[in-house]
């Protein structure tokens, strides 16, 4: 949400001023973050951790990832949920890889207004952040999750066939609202599905999958865009819609059961 409200409008203005400025400032942001990390006193790192943490830190990165992947594979509901989110992440990345070109060249929006358009979509995320708990309580977590995964998927397709920027903006608002609902409630599901003492390792392995496929999706999206800037959104939208339909019942059941804190063994029986 902050990315869309502040980052996107600022990047649009910078892009309009000089095409290299967004990239320069983005790199500068990483540099500043690295400086702050090095400014953390060493004694806080070496003496501020617990014995359990110290033991965990001795394990290699590969062994941690291996443990997480094994856990994900052996837990059927968690495995299917990760497979669903990974495939969605891949096609979302594919569909949005050339979004700025679609907006500026097909919808004919000036580059300096690109961020304003994204901020409008971000307002849907803000509204969802306020309403998601109420919607979940009123309609049930499973219902909201299932509807959110479908709406956030099919809106990708609708964006690809948008005739003008106004329609695109409205669809973007709806999409951001649905995606934020999905993300908030999805994290609640993970907190039930993954034991607290293992959450870091399992969640890290999950993110390795989800974020690992996104650059590949973006690359393929760029290739597809050579056939037309609408194509990535249309292809990605069709794929995400089919994935959401295939996962609709699973997500509905999973959401309702995790809202009761239930995982073993009923979730495995219904997966």
Regions found by a protein language model. Name each.
Residues 24, 83-84, 204:
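Phosphate-coordinating loops and pocket residues in cytosolic domains that bind phosphorylated ligands
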Residues 16, 40, 70-74, 92:
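Residues at helix-coil transition
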Residues 1-48, 119, 123, 220-223, ...:
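Hydrophobic alpha-helical transmembrane segments
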Residues 37-55, 180-194:
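Juxtamembrane interface at the ends
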């Amino acid at each position: 949400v902050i990315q869309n409200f502040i980052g996107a409008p600022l990047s649009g203005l910078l892009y309009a001023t000089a095409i290299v400025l967004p990239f320069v400032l983005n790199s500068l942001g990483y540099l500043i973050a690295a400086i702050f990390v090095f400014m953390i006193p060493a004694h806080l790192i070496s003496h501020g951790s617990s014995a359990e943490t110290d033991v965990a830190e001795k394990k290699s990165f590969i062994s941690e990832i291996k443990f997480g992947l094994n856990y994900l594979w052996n837990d059927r509901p968690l495995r299917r949920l990760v497979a669903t989110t990974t495939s969605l992440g891949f096609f979302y990345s594919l569909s949005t890889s050339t979004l700025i070109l679609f907006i500026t060249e097909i919808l004919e929006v000036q580059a300096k207004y690109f961020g304003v358009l994204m901020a409008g979509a971000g307002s849907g995320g803000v509204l969802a952040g306020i309403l998601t708990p109420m919607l979940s309580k009123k309609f049930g977590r499973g219902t909201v999750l299932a509807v959110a995964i479908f709406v956030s998927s099919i809106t990708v397709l609708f964006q690809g066939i948008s005739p003008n920027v106004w329609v695109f903006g409205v669809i973007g608002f709806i999409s951001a609202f649905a995606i934020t609902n999905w993300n908030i409630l999805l994290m609640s599901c993970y907190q039930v599905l993954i034991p607290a003492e293992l959450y870091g390792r399992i969640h890290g392995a999950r993110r390795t999958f989800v974020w690992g496929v996104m650059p590949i999706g973006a690359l393929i999206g760029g290739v597809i865009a050579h056939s037309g800037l609408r194509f990535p959104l249309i292809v990605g939208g069709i794929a995400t819609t089919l994935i959401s339909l295939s996962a609709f019942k699973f997500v509905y059941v999973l959401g309702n059961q995790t809202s009761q804190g239930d995982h073993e063994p009923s979730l495995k029986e219904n997966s």
